[in-house]
Amino acid sequence: GFGSVLGKALKIGANLL
């Protein structure tokens, strides 16, 4: 669901950092 999308975005953001 939406939470899964948020989790994915956070994972990608962490990778960028």
Swiss-Prot record:
One of its GO terms (cellular component) is extracellular region. Disulfide bonds: none annotated. One of its GO terms (biological process) is defense response. Expressed by the skin glands. Keywords: Amidation, Amphibian defense peptide, Secreted. The keyword Cell membrane does not apply. It is found in: Secreted. The modification Leucine amide is found at L17. The keyword Secreted applies. Belongs to the gastrin/cholecystokinin family. This is Caerulein precursor fragment-related peptide R1. It comes from Xenopus ruwenzoriensis.
